[in-house]
Swiss-Prot record:
The keyword Membrane applies. This is Probable outer membrane protein pmp2. The gene is pmp2. Pfam families: Autotransporter, Chlam_PMP, ChlamPMP_M. It comes from Chlamydia pneumoniae (Chlamydophila pneumoniae). Residues 1-24 form the signal peptide. InterPro entries: Autotransporte_beta (IPR005546), Autotransporte_beta_dom_sf (IPR036709), Polymorphic_membr_middle (IPR011427), POMP_repeat (IPR003368). The keyword ATP-binding does not apply. Belongs to the PMP outer membrane protein family. Residues 537-841 form the Autotransporter domain. It is found in: Secreted, Cell wall; Cell outer membrane. NCBIfam families: POMP_repeat. One of its GO terms (cellular component) is cell outer membrane.
Amino acid sequence: MKIPLRFLLISLVPTLSMSNLLGAATTEELSASNSFDGTTSTTSFSSKTSSATDGTNYVFKDSVVIENVPKTGETQSTSCFKNDAAAGDLNFLGGGFSFTFSNIDATTASGAAIGSEAANKTVTLSGFSALSFLKSPASTVTNGLGAINVKGNLSLLDNDKVLIQDNFSTGDGGAINCAGSLKIANNKSLSFIGNSSSTRGGAIHTKNLTLSSGGETLFQGNTAPTAAGKGGAIAIADSGTLSISGDSGDIIFEGNTIGATGTVSHSAIDLGTSAKITALRAAQGHTIYFYDPITVTGSTSVADALNINSPDTGDNKEYTGTIVFSGEKLTEAEAKDEKNRTSKLLQNVAFKNGTVVLKGDVVLSANGFSQDANSKLIMDLGTSLVANTESIELTNLEINIDSLRNGKKIKLSAATAQKDIRIDRPVVLAISDESFYQNGFLNEDHSYDGILELDAGKDIVISADSRSIDAVQSPYGYQGKWTINWSTDDKKATVSWAKQSFNPTAEQEAPLVPNLLWGSFIDVRSFQNFIELGTEGAPYEKRFWVAGISNVLHRSGRENQRKFRHVSGGAVVGASTRMPGGDTLSLGFAQLFARDKDYFMNTNFAKTYAGSLRLQHDASLYSVVSILLGEGGLREILLPYVSKTLPCSFYGQLSYGHTDHRMKTESLPPPPPTLSTDHTSWGGYVWAGELGTRVAVENTSGRGFFQEYTPFVKVQAVYARQDSFVELGAISRDFSDSHLYNLAIPLGIKLEKRFAEQYYHVVAMYSPDVCRSNPKCTTTLLSNQGSWKTKGSNLARQAGIVQASGFRSLGAAAELFGNFGFEWRGSSRSYNVDAGSKIKF
């Protein structure tokens, strides 16, 4: 049987671990038979004691659960697993199984679950799929001493899930008390929740702690609930060390407290006298959150500086993650107590790399502060940076632009005599995301007076470069200019905003709205062409026709213009009659259904009703020229050269259409990330007029395919308008009315071919647009009053048009006809297809 590589590697881990740890140590295998439940067991619980000087290894062959110890009516005064003072190392090798302690009420045992009296020896728990210490002991045990208590060192390594919850100690370390060094590393999930100590370290008390995340790491709701309590989550003993590395997951301190009822305050970590933080760092993409402050015991400064986001000596790993000190999770009452917002270190602090963020009115206090060019310090208004004994030197100070309107100030203080504050680069206005520039308050100019306050014991040095401000801009939203002005003594800085314009995002712009007028333009021209087509064919005195009509317009996309498509179709009915004077009068009505889309967020559905009136006057070219030349010598010179039989036509046409629009907008507004579909309705209309003339030239030579050549020239005018409207929905916008005007002078030739019962013609024309007003409207985003011009497409002003039509008689009283047209412009293409029948009256 083939063994998958993944399972082979997993099986090798405990094997390799044991080969390193077992040596001459005593080995005992643990299985499900070693589990115990005091509520169901008929025997008393028996603790395991290790005394082998070469050490003891517990090798797990199955999951083990020890719970409800002791049985009702009995007492438990010894740790479930005990390591004697003379014993060697104690190793628990999980082998991928789980190990659980729950409700272990060991009254006087130092470590209800695990206790080790062996100084300078190490207890290791590694390789478990789940490792849990729950209520071991619970706070109901008034003399409990935590879940794990070791006089040497302790390691929690390479476990999938570690949950340490609701444990209690009357001494130090509600869950863990380690006299030596505690190493917690590479655990995929680690949670210390609701543990409590009557003295120091609600969850952990130790001399030296190395905490390295292998996944999300959470310290929540731990407490030292006495007047003398220190370190809600972690307490470091005097002269101890603390190293925190967010290597493979976020680390969160939240809701950890100290103090008796009525004097409760927040505390994440307490550093004993002369204790120090040796490392505070997060890898790229990870963050360490201090929603509770760091406190110190005593006032003795530590010589070693804290280099934030700096690797160990000789390690090339880069730490570019984020360290956050925040008071955001405090209640309004808690935020009023400065202790809940103040983190204090008795070390010099150097920001070496990555980002340090101060939020929610916190105060970060240390001996002094310096900053390398590769790091960023981002401060909310209301936060403070306080140097107690040294100077402050900053190279990359950023102000969180989202906090500008909270009415507070950023404070930098180095008030000790002969100490300076130095800012070597421009202050930066930082934004968390580009949506900031969608805020409606940016619609007006603003000045934020004195939002940066500096207090130095000696000098405030603002370099020449720092007297300007760098703002992270967005290509979308409100556009404007940020400026910074320093007071004469450089103790205060004022930041100002001057609005310039508003640039919509692609989701907000909606160019389809003005482009709908191009759809009306195409439809009304096609309708007018159809009315002209209805007068063609057999020379009936009176005729009635009915047909289907369809149009397609495709506008290609450009760098600054979105592509769109218009498709319409419907029915046309019409009639024409020859009047007593020989003129032809035509009348038509149409109903069209259209669909427009911009290939992005908007789709429009439209319904158009249109009517058209056309009058054509036929005469000979000779009579027309005779009238135009009037009386005089020029008439006598030119008129003899004009054919008296060549037919000429003049015609005029007027059309009107009304359109009802219904637009669908699909958007993805955050939050929640769910697709939203909104519908909006409004109306519009279109007028179109046309004047033209043509001369039909008969091919009498008998040569060539076509029998008649008809050159023509037209003047076409189209005016389309749509009403203003307000769109309501996820993206609410107000669109002003918009219009399109276009004047074209098409000229071309019609080539005709006739048979006994059939008739064809082909038209080729060139149509320049000599005057045009492109569609546009003013759009206002109702959520922030941002306003901009939404411009429709600017179709190329020269068009080449080809049309082909065919007619076939069905006896003396009926006729079928069809037409295909294609229009090409440099930026668009349009097609129309018509087919119908005529009936003679």
